[in-house]
Curated annotation (Swiss-Prot):
Protein known as: Structure-specific endonuclease subunit SLX4 1
Gene: SLX4-1
Family under the similarity heading: Belongs to the SLX4 family.
Phylogenetic classification of the source organism: Eukaryota, Fungi, Dikarya, Ascomycota, Saccharomycotina
Complexes and interactors: Forms a heterodimer with SLX1.
GO BP term, pick one: DNA recombination
Organism: Candida tropicalis (strain ATCC MYA-3404 / T1) (Yeast)
Pfam families linked to this entry: Slx4 (PF09494)
Domain of life: Eukaryota
Region annotation Disordered: where it falls in the sequence: 1-116, 337-369
GO MF annotation terms: 5'-flap endonuclease activity
């Protein structure tokens, strides 16, 4: 080969080697970066590793030393510091091929991969080498899974067999016991089987030594001392009864063995008054009862507190004096507590009677004595009528009822028309009669007993009619109503008192002359029931008016008609016209009293229930409730349909439909509502009153809210 050919061949080889070295160097850099990323991930996962120092040795971790260069911050210093220069070894120039050879020959990456494989093998085991003989692997093989599942099924079957054996043991009757078991165990095994007479006799013939030899008695304090029997042991044998018979016995009667001390001290729990129990007859062949007794004081204390009355009373009696009550003989009953069944027979009163040594008890309740005057204020508004209300002196009148019937209940009224006060009702009460049956047995109590008497609330009304009437005395015992005429046909003078009274003006019928003395005074007494009387309304006066009657030929003789009450107490048979010597001028036209409507016939309690049913605002007084319902009835015609309304929604729908039609007739108010102008509810009420429609403000407010009408209070 020529020298030129050799040179060209050498150049080609050099180029080839250079490119080969460059590629190897690039691959080495890539492997090194990959190894560094793996090392970083391993260092992060090492914090979650559970190290076991006993079984495994820690994996060595290469330490990386970083040299931190310190910069001199104090540049502006007066003194210059000498720097210690570190002598560094001169670096040896190394070619790229040699550096590649060193990196490739050290095989650092291979060592790191081997350490990682060793860690994984130690933790999770070798999957390929897993077999039944090598149990070092933590992976469970298929055979192990199958054995575990079979063991679970077998254990369930064993549990089922065990349960069946237990149930069969308790359900099936036990076989006869063999030798070595006594009759007590046989009796407890089958309690329903009764023992024979010979077996019972053999049990009772047992010696006490046999009983004590079979039992072990030891002292609690010292277990090393020999057993000693200080007290005799009494054993009571009882045959267990059937469930139906055993259920009738008490809880303490089913004990088969009881240990009873020979002497039990008697403890008296009730020390005052002194009491010595009488000896009781001990039953023969019964369970021994203990002598411990409890003394119980029997007292039937009767409450003497009076019932709360519906009427507020202002009692003007003097302070009651303390009243001494005589002591009575108190009976003490002894109840003996025993573990056995309690004897139903109680000791007689005669055998155990003691006298109480306690001091007399002063009762805070004063027994009613004499006459007490109770003043009750009743609010009423009396309209102008031809009847004068005359105040009558109650001392000159006779009793309406007897003392027994009128205790705390008889009412007398004397009506007047004071200027700033309401009419006054005087309630009179008297002492109760003594009970004639003194020999009757009274309940044992140290408190005074007050005999309860049913209360009656009576109302007496005095009417003065400016006409001559012939009234027959009338008494209705069933309804407790009494009517009579007082005095002659002359006016009764009103007694002068310190209080100024305002006289009720007379009507047109009484205008006949100042010297006309043709008047009639009628007194009506009736019973007021609780449902007819409330504190919010006045039931003092009847609705009295003058009407013409077709049966009377003489129109100058008026007839009194009383209405507005369920039981009419006057009719045409009781009141007859009386001819007068002189004619009384009567006006041509007489205003007639309106007949009572269906709403007026209802009581205040019934109307209050209607208000609550319809959701109306509750008001005080029957007259106010009737007035509100009459205003609502104008929107619901006829009136009987108002009382037939079932609920609140039906009533509101009927009122609101008629109210819409009434408002649309008045164009002024209707235009304001259409323009969303705020209106006052009082203005709407005044507009309706101008058209003879009367509704309360709460009903109008509900109408505005349901219809979306804007309202204001300004």
């Amino acid at each position: 080969m020529s020298p030129e050919g050799e040179e060209s061949h050498a150049e080609d080889n050099l180029y080839f080697h250079n490119t080969q070295m460059q590629s190897i160097h690039e691959e080495t850099l890539a492997e090194e970066s990959h190894a560094q990323s793996i090392q970083r991930s391993i260092s992060r996962l090492s914090s979650f590793k559970h190290e076991d120092t006993d079984s495994e040795s820690p994996i060595p971790v290469q330490k990386v030393i970083r040299h931190i260069k310190k910069t001199n911050t104090n540049t502006n210093t007066t003194k210059t510091k000498k720097r210690k220069l570190k002598v560094s070894k001169p670096r040896k120039n190394m070619s790229s091929s040699e550096s590649v050879r060193q990196m490739y020959g050290s095989r650092k990456n291979g060592e790191q991969q081997g350490s990682i494989d060793g860690f994984l093998m130690s933790r999770f085991g070798d999957v390929d080498g897993c077999n039944e003989s090598d149990r070092s692997s933590k992976l469970i093989s298929q055979g192990e899974w199958e054995s575990l599942s079979k063991f679970h099924e077998e254990s369930n079957e064993k549990d089922k067999l065990l349960r069946k054996k237990i149930q069969r043991y308790y359900s099936e009757p036990q076989e006869e016991l063999g030798e070595g078991c006594g009759m007590l165990s046989q009796a407890s095994a089958d309690p329903e089987t009764k023992m024979t007479k010979e077996e019972l006799e053999s049990l009772y013939d047992l010696d006490s030594s046999t009983v004590f030899n079979q039992t072990t008695i030891s002292a609690i304090g010292d277990m090393s001392e020999p057993t000693q029997v200080s007290e005799p042991c009494v054993v009571i044998l009882s045959q267990t009864k059937v469930q139906s018979e055993a259920s009738t016995q008490e809880d303490g009667a089913d004990a088969s063995v009881q240990e009873i001390k020979s002497s039990v001290p008697t403890q008296e729990l009730f020390s005052t008054p002194e009491f010595v129990p009488a000896p009781l007859e001990q039953p023969v062949n019964k369970e021994v009862c203990s002598d411990q007794s409890i003394v119980v004081l029997e007292e039937n204390v009767q409450s003497t507190q009076a019932d709360d009355s519906d009427i507020v009373e202002l009692i003007s009696d003097s302070d009651p004096e303390p009243e001494e009550v005589s002591t009575k003989v108190q009976v003490l009953r002894s109840i003996y507590d025993s573990s056995g069944p309690v004897n139903d027979k109680q000791p007689s009163v005669a055998s155990e009677t003691v006298e109480s040594d306690s001091t007399p008890i002063v009762s805070p309740v004063k027994t009613p004595q004499g006459t007490r005057m109770h003043v009750v204020q009743v609010a009423s508004s009396n309209p102008s009528s031809p009847i004068k209300i005359v105040e009558e002196n109650t001392e000159q009148q006779e009793e309406v009822f007897t003392d027994v019937e009128s205790i705390y209940s008889t009412a007398r009224t004397s009506f007047g028309t004071p200027k700033h006060t309401s009419p006054v009702i005087l309630l009179e009460s008297s002492d109760t009669d003594c009970d004639d049956n003194d020999n009757d047995v009274e309940p044992l109590s140290s408190m005074p007993m007050v005999k309860t008497v049913p209360k009656k609330r009576m109302r007496t009304t005095v009417l003065q009619v400016s006409a001559a009437l012939k009234v027959q005395n009338y008494t209705d015992e069933k309804n407790n109503i009494k009517l009579r005429k007082i005095g002659d046909d002359i006016p009764v003078e009103v007694p002068t008192k310190d209080v100024e009274y305002e006289e009720i003006p007379d009507s047109q019928e009484s205008v006949g002359g100042e010297g006309d003395n043709s008047v009639s005074i009628i007194e009506i007494t009736r019973e007021v029931h609780n449902n007819d009387y409330t504190g919010d309304e006045s039931t003092d006066l009847f609705q009295v008016g003058l009407n013409k009657q077709d049966t009377c030929e003489d129109t100058s003789s008026p007839v009194v008609q009383i209405g507005g009450v369920e039981n009419d107490i006057l009719d045409s048979s009781l009141i007859e016209p009386v001819p007068e010597p002189e004619s009384v001028p009567v006006p041509e036209e007489v205003q007639e009293q309106p007949q009572p409507t269906a709403i007026d016939k209802h009581t205040a309690t019934q109307l209050r229930e209607k208000f609550q049913l319809w959701g109306l605002k509750p008001v005080r007084g029957k007259e106010k409730m009737v007035e509100i319902l009459q205003g609502i009835s104008n929107f619901i015609l006829p009136e009987h349909e108002l009382l037939a309304v079932a609920d609140k929604q039906e009533l509101q729908s009927c009122i609101f439909m008629k109210l819409d039609a009434v408002i649309r007739e008045g164009r002024a108010m209707y235009d304001r509502i259409l323009s969303f102008e705020p209106i006052r509810i009082e203005e709407l009420q005044m507009m309706l009153q101008s058209q003879d429609y009367y509704l309360e403000l709460d009903v109008l407010r509900l109408y505005c809210d349901s219809s979306g009408i804007t309202t204001t209070n300004a």
